[in-house]
Every structure is written in C-alpha cells, then in structure tokens.
C-alpha cells in the first residue's frame, strides 16, 4: 500500500490512462458510445483528482511540509498527533479528499460515470473498474481521510454511511 500521499496521488491519477484506452478503444459497441463513456469517465475522475490536488497541497501547507520536513507526505507522519494543524481548513481539506474518493467509489450522487462506462467495457475491463478502481475510492476514505482527519471524518460519517447505503441499494435495484 502507498504510504506516501504524493505517490498515492500520482498513482490515483495514473490509473486513468490505461482505463481510458481500455474503455474508449477496446470496449464493445459503436465507437461513438465507447468514446463518450471513456470521456465521461475521464472527466469525472479528473475533476475529482483536481479537487484532491487542492487537498494534497493543503495538507502540505498545513502539515509537516510547512516546517520543511522531508517526509511531509508520509502517512505515518501526517497521522501523528498534531501533525496537521489546519484549524478551520481541516474540514475543507477532508472534503477535497472525500469528493475525489466518492467519485472513484462510485458513490451516489457522483456515480453517473459508471453505468455508461461499464456498459461498453469488456469483461476484463469491467473487472478492473469494479474490482480495483472502485475499491481505491473506498480504501482512500478509510486509510487516508479517517486517519489524517479523524475529527472531521467523525462529523461526516453518518452522511457517508447513508450515501453508501443508498449507493448499495441503488446499484442493486438498477442492476
């Protein structure tokens, strides 16, 4: 598992490149539908990634990076008591990560990229989308949001639980 937030962010965004081609070029159906699904997937993911980039920069500014620490992005350093002194910005920073992870998860209401993408993706690509990519969003919520922003995460946990349940039920009923 990536224990460095910057490395995680790079890999988080790097996943888009092969999946774009797997969906857009090698999916099934007509080329226009494949291209539309691939572009929709990339735009959603890039929007989430851009929001998360603001969070990564904020973690650097308000965290150990402000003191010039070499390991400013290491999760163990970020989760140490008092490592992130963001004050009122802590909630905003946590939301930046949460939005990006909710898009990847895909959680209602930012899940609309998945049906069109899964519809044109081949079996192996769908396995990557559902078996790997979706889990990265959930993993990020648990391993990054909760430890770095424990107080802020506790405040939004009931909302996340409701959205997760709605996502599960919506997915089951729409399938």
Where on the chain are the PLM-derived regions?
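Short phosphate-coordinating micro-motif centered on Lys-Gly-acidic
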Residues: 13
């Amino acid at each position: 598992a990536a224990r460095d937030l910057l490395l995680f962010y790079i890999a988080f965004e790097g996943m888009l490149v092969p999946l774009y081609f797997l969906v857009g070029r090698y999916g099934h159906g007509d080329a226009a539908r494949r291209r539309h699904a691939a572009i929709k997937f990339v735009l959603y993911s890039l929007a989430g990634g851009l929001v998360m980039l603001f969070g990564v920069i904020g973690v650097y500014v308000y965290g150990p990076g402000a003191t010039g620490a070499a390991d400013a992005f290491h999760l163990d350093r970020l989760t140490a008591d008092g490592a992130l002194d963001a004050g009122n910005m802590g909630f905003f920073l946590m939301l930046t990560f949460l939005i990006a992870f909710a898009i990847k998860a895909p959680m209602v209401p930012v899940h609309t990229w998945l049906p069109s993408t899964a519809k044109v993706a081949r079996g192996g690509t769908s396995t990557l989308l559902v078996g790997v990519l979706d889990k990265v969003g959930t993993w990020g919520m648990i391993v990054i949001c909760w430890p770095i922003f424990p107080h802020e995460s506790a405040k939004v946990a009931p909302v996340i639980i409701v959205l997760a349940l709605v996502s599960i039920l919506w997915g089951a009923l729409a399938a």
